[in-house]
Amino acid sequence: GGIDLSVGSMIALLGVIFVDMVGKFGVPWPVAILVVIVIGTLLGLAHGLLITKLRMQPFVVTLCGLLIYRGAARGYTGEATAGFPFGANYPALEWLTIGRSLGVPHSFFAMIIIGIVCWFLLHRSVFGRHLQAVGKNEDAARYSGIRTGFVITAAYVICAVLTAVAAVYFAMFTRSVQPSSHGNFYELYAIAAAVLGGFSLRGGEGSIIGVVLGAVLLQELQNLVNLLGIPSSLNFAVMGAVILAGVLADQQFNRYRAKRRAAIALGVLNRKGSAPRQAPVAIDEIR
């Protein structure tokens, strides 16, 4: 499995582009959203091709992306904050992103819709089964006829597209984007939510429902830190402890499962070895 470390920096870069297109250049917001998604798609495609065609390590590719996108966002704005003009209103866009219906934020509905689509894609489609197979063992998946290069590239494209959508929501929520800090450590939040939701860092295991619950649990942990009066500066320490605990639990679970499989296999062999053999029939008895 691979981890995309460029998520936070990509949110900053795409957020700056979106805010400037809508607020500075007057581009209609549906067009701006489409452009941001296209840019995100191209960035994800670049990640996938570098990993599959040039055989670069996902960690190296996405780490370089983290640095490049953050630097590009800061260079584009000249370290200035990108924001919407004072008093500017975008009723339809604001209703879609930060509005509420029946007291429920529309971002929650967006999360549910995206979660359902991703659940179907991962658990009820051929691509999802191929993705899990590649995550467990890329070589075995390749030998079984799966187009591993396509699957890996598609995974990074999907990740980048979802990051582009998140960039729009975050930009509308904050109303401004500070390129040096916007989206900082968001990739760690994503990793922590996935680990809490039962995803294996080894790849090939996990569920969409689990990662949604993991994201909810992570937010509740942050709220608990605030309620307990723990300084907000320790949020990252709590997050690191959560990730560490999740990794340790994942390793222990994998060891337990391996021992259980070995015990079952040994039991099957023992039963076969102890099966009664049919006594040979004497020729005289047949006569």
Task: List PLM regions with ranges.
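Single transmembrane alpha-helix segments in multi-pass membrane proteins
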Residues: G1-F25, L49-M56, I191-A194, G198-I208, ...
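Transmembrane helix-bundle core of multi-pass membrane transporters
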Residues: P58-R124, V151-A154, F173-H182, K259-I286
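Hydrophobic core segments of alpha-helical transmembrane domains in multi-pass membrane transport
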Residues: L66, R70-G71, A110-L121, Y156-A167, ...
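Cytosolic-side transmembrane-helix boundaries in multi-pass membrane proteins
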Residues: Y143-F150, L221-R287
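Transmembrane alpha-helical segments in multi-pass inner-membrane proteins
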Residues: T163, T174-M239
